[in-house]
Structures are given as C-alpha cells and as structure tokens.
Amino acid sequence: MSEAYKTVYIGDTAEIVEKKSRFIANLEHVESEEEALAYIETIRKKYWDARHNCYAYCIGKKQELKRCSDDGEPSQTAGKPMLDVLTGAGLCDTVVVVTRYFGGTLLGTGGLVRAYTAAAKAGVEASEVIEKIPAVQFLVKVTYNQIGTLLYLLGQRGYSQLESEYAEDVSVRFLVPLTERASMEKQLLESFQGSAKTEIEDYGYYAKNGKELLLFEEEV
C-alpha cells in the first residue's frame, strides 16, 4: 500500500556565516534526477563566482535515488552531511545546493561538516514542507434528512469536503486517507443502513498547507 511522504512544496534560500565564509542553501522540489541536475546547474550559473556549489538530492516516494557531491571540498565534508539532513528530515523529491564563498579562514573537516549541515538545515526550515497523503475520493449521495448525519461523520473524522451538490438528493465529494478507506465504508454502511449511495471516484495524494488543501494527481 502507498504511504505518506514528505517533500518540499516551495523551496527557499537561507544563509549562514562561519568564520567569514558564507554558506548559501537553496532548496527545490524535483520529481526526477534530470530535474535535480537542471536545478543544480541553475544554481551554479547564479553563483558562478563561488568556490563550491555542493549538493544532495533524494528522488522517489521512498528516497529510492540518493546522490550527493562535495564539489571540491574534502571528501565526506559537504555532500554527505547535506544528504543526511534530507534523509533525516524524511524529505523525498527534494534537492539542496549549498554554495560556499570562502572567507579566508580554513574550517577543517569537522568545521566544514558542521557548516554544511547547519546551512542545509536552515534551508529546510526556510522552505515550505508538506506531507503528501495517499487518498481516495468518495462520492456519497444521501437524502436531505440524512445530510446532517453525513456532515457530522465527516467532521468527526476531520475529512475535508471537496464539493457539495444539492439537487433531488445531496451529493458530497470528500477525501479519505487510503488507510482509512475500509473503516469509512463500514461506518457509512452502518450509519445509513445501506441507503446511502457510495462511489469511489478517484485516487491521488493530498496535503494540508495551513488551511489550504492541496491536491496532487499522482499514482497511488
């Protein structure tokens, strides 16, 4: 069964300074290695005069593809710590590039690891992160006498209505997390003794960004 996963929804920029060296983190949502590499190249062109543009990315709903680069920094001091930040935060389909402008003072391997880690974390904190939840779209038709019961049930479960149509009957579309589909079908059957007409219309992912409901047409 498909599982929920976290990703950057809107990437942002963050900067830290360590012994006069500037570390600038840029994050972005990507859905393929090609998109990740294209974004990395964009950042390299933007900061063309920087000494290093180190990067890390995780692609896939279960972080199936993971890559990183130290871009000239000592081995394991930049890309790997940045990748650890992404994996530790559970971020999928995300790329981070940290640009370094050398400040004249050597940081040592330990200092570099701490600086690149801190920059990547600052970038994650500055970005908008969402959790995409696999869901099924229900269409339920009830009578006017039954609509109160249905809306109460949805409120109890914390489900968001997508659309309501009041005609001869009342039709309500709403999303149910995939893991709760069976229990929802059972509760509808018990609550309306089989009189409610229920259809499964679609599958996909949704996320909540504050009060905003985001819908994604992704294969579940």
Residue ranges of model-derived segments:
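Terminal, non-globular segments
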Residues: 174-183
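Short amphipathic alpha-helix segments
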Residues: 141-159
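Short glycine-/aliphatic-rich beta-strand segments at the starts of folded cytosolic domains
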Residues: 129-146
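Active-site beta-strand/loop microenvironment that shapes enzyme catalytic pockets
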Residues: 78-127
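Flexible, glycine/charged-enriched surface loops at secondary-structure junctions
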Residues: 50-54, 129-134, 162, 195-199
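Short, flexible turn/loop "capping" segments at secondary-structure junctions
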Residues: 16-20, 130-132, 165-166
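C-terminal regulatory domains involved in ligand/effector binding and gene-expression control
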Residues: 1-77, 181, 191, 199-220
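Short amphipathic alpha-helices in soluble, non-transmembrane regions
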Residues: 150-156, 183-192
